[in-house]
Amino acid sequence: MGSNKRAPLPYRTDRTKNFEKAWKRYNKSGRYDMQAAAVAMNLVTNRNPVPAEYRDHELTGEWAGFRELHIGGDFLLVYRVDEKSEIIYFVDLGTHAELFE
């Protein structure tokens, strides 16, 4: 007894066109585990702690204000959290080479 039944309201979400194109491309190719990508998205959307294996971190330089987490290996999810508006923007998916070079 006594378990807490309260939870914060999940963030609202939005997706960029780049994110949607990447999702469709990777989902069609079968190259990466898109179920794992959906799990990672749910973790951040529902304000759950992101496990250390995702290596979630802030980006710097021209990507300052964005975050990145590792879905598996070098497969990355780039997103941005707008705390004031309580929205998570899913920005892109891909490898380091595809996203940052």
List the model feature ranges, each with a label.
Residues 91:
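Active-site flanking residues adjacent to catalytic metal/cofactor-binding acidic residues
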Residues 79:
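Acidic, metal-associated active-site segment
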Residues 94:
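Residues forming the ATP-binding cleft of Hanks-type serine/threonine protein kinase domains
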Residues 1-73, 82-88, 97-101:
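Basic, Lys/Arg-enriched alpha-helical interface segments
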